């Protein structure tokens, strides 16, 4: 009997989840229903952040800045209004405000001056520095990112890159783009409704001109250079033109989702699948040939006992194979966290496959991540308690209390530190204090109670009965090959799951640090499935050879070996820094390597837990198949 109050606990769990989802998604998500505009109607235009971009394959910084940061001196509307954002948008650094640019459906505008501003020399130097680091400006028109055409594409088959350059480095100096040629594509439905299906900007640099102190559109072909050590008077202007498009509203995001490396990705996924298939084949050989033959021989009444002692090492440790590992408290907490991350990752991939998480829903990825992590506190508590009980741990109350606080507490402390670094650089990525309070409130109100409920159910669940008895006196472990030691096994075994996600890791890091849209969830779905399978296969093979060498300390080994994939992720991040990021900023380095370390640790927990679960089922299965006198 599991728990007398299971029905009431289940009802409470459902209520908790319902309230949590309502709380998380009560933040405005980007709407997915089309908006129709009659001729002359005002188009929704907003400004976002100034963000880094990978120029010539390299990035130079990772800090975002608000569009209306005083150092930019951009033109402002009469009343600046902050736009509603999802929780995920706030966490990912989006800061949306209304725009001073007025656009009306099907009305062309030829060079409209916005304003004139005086930029002091210190701010000119700041802007020059960002231009040299390939920063881009981010606008939105009808909730669609304003973009520029990617180089090397043609008019029939083109893709767009969200954002447009702040300026450009030339041989004569640094120029600032202060005129924006805005081209908006529209589509007319069968009911004569007009919809925005594309928006891009061709930024131009024009020498600023004032007439009687008022800004006017310059007819000069000279660019606007940014002087060194001097103030600058800047005039900003824009033009608007409309272009009909056959693209329906439902597919307007396809232009942003051009994948030039699609063929390479499929080839890599096929290679990863081949590796995975080979591992499955090896495990199948072990299970259906070697083990089956060994078990039949071992169970035979006519086999000589000395032959058994000689030939079948994995069966000799049957009296110790379920002996509890060292540090069961720590081990169980890490397994609970890994199960929580597995639940969260699986949910995100499934949400993306079904379109709940998509680039068109701004902030949906981060919002879903937060919601799933909070809900999966139940999974963490249950798996941690069940594992601790399996390992014959005695401090159950301590396990119940530590599970929801150890790893999440480490993550919170790291995130607060990173937030202080963002704040010191006046970056828009600084998470507001109110958002921190909300996250902590959600965690304490939902995750901690859910974790406690999961732990109670786990501790009161049916006792696990090992298929073989554990001897009172531990068996002496003989010496074995160095290749069967923990470290060499982890180095070899952890490299295989890492190779499965290597190509996808490039795209994830590019999206994380330089903000291109990440939409390749189809590839992620295959990679994630192959990763999970590979971790299980690697762990099973490692444990099998370890048991064959009569070493029964397999518990931690089954966790560390596939978990070593996280170490490779960090090593890869170091190479990514040297080959893709050219920055001498200490703050940038601290943030980059801090986030990389945090992500690598979480990958370690995820892969390690998956490997242990597979190995435990494997060990339980094979020892349940032999007869012990």
UniProtKB/Swiss-Prot annotation:
UniProt keyword Coiled coil, yes or no: no
Main location: Golgi
Transmembrane segments: 267-287, 338-358, 365-385, 402-422, 437-457, 489-509, 520-544, 559-579, 599-619
Signal peptide location: 1-26
UniProt keyword Magnesium, yes or no: no
Annotated Gene Ontology cellular component terms: endosome membrane; fungal-type vacuole membrane; Golgi apparatus; Golgi membrane; membrane
Membrane topology: Multi-pass membrane protein
Lumenal membrane side: 27-266, 359-364, 423-436, 510-519, 580-598
Stretches assigned to the Cytoplasmic side: 288-337, 386-401, 458-488, 545-558, 620-629
Localization per record: Golgi apparatus membrane; Vacuole membrane
Pfam families reported for this sequence: EMP70
Glycosylation site positions: 157
Record key words, sorted: Glycoprotein, Golgi apparatus, Membrane, Signal, Transmembrane, Transmembrane helix, Vacuole
Gene Ontology BP, a term: protein localization to membrane
Family: Belongs to the nonaspanin (TM9SF) (TC 9.A.2) family.
PANTHER family: TRANSMEMBRANE 9 SUPERFAMILY MEMBER 2, TRANSMEMBRANE 9 SUPERFAMILY PROTEIN
Protein name: Transmembrane 9 superfamily protein C1105.08
Lineage: Eukaryota, Fungi, Dikarya, Ascomycota, Taphrinomycotina
